[in-house]
Amino acid sequence: MARYMLLLLLAVWVLTGELWPGAEARAAPYGVRLCGREFIRAVIFTCGGSRWRRSDILAHEAMGDTFPDADADEDSLAGELDEAMGSSEWLALTKSPQAFYRGRPSWQGTPGVLRGSRDVLAGLSSSCCKWGCSKSEISSLC
C-alpha cells in the first residue's frame, strides 16, 4: 500500500512538471531579460532590421508611377529654382543664417523635451534587465 502511495505521489510530481527536463529552462512569463549590450543589440535589430527596409521598398513599389507627368514639369521647376536662388531673399538668407532663425523658438529653451526619450530608454532598459520585456515593448522605441 505504501508503495502505491509513493508511486502515486511520484506520478503527481512528474505531471506537475517538477521533474521534466527543461522545467528549469522555461522562459520568464513576462519576456526576455536583456541587459546592457544585449538590450542595445535587440533595439538595433528590432528597429533597424531588414523588415523595416523591406517595408519601405514594398511601399515604394506599390506606389508605382504615381506621378507620370513629373518629368515634363522638371524643366519648368528647374527654371523656377534658378530664379528663386537669384532673388534677394535667398541671398540674404545664405549670407546671414541668424536671419532665417530669427523669431523661432530655440531648442535650448526646452531641455526636458530632449531628455524625455532618453529617460524612456533608460527606464525600459532597466525594466528589461530586471523583469524582461517583449519585442513589442522594444519596438515602441523605434
UniProtKB/Swiss-Prot annotation:
Q: Name one GO molecular function term.
A: G protein-coupled receptor binding
Q: Name one GO cellular component term.
A: extracellular region
Query: Which residues belong to the signal peptide in this entry?
Result: 1-25
> Which Cys residues form disulphide pairs?
C35-C129, C47-C142, C128-C133
Q: Which UniProt keywords apply?
A: Cleavage on pair of basic residues, Disulfide bond, Hormone, Secreted, Signal
Q: Which residues comprise the propeptide?
A: 55-118
Q: What is this protein called?
A: Relaxin-3
Organism in which the protein naturally occurs: Homo sapiens
Supply the gene name. RLN3
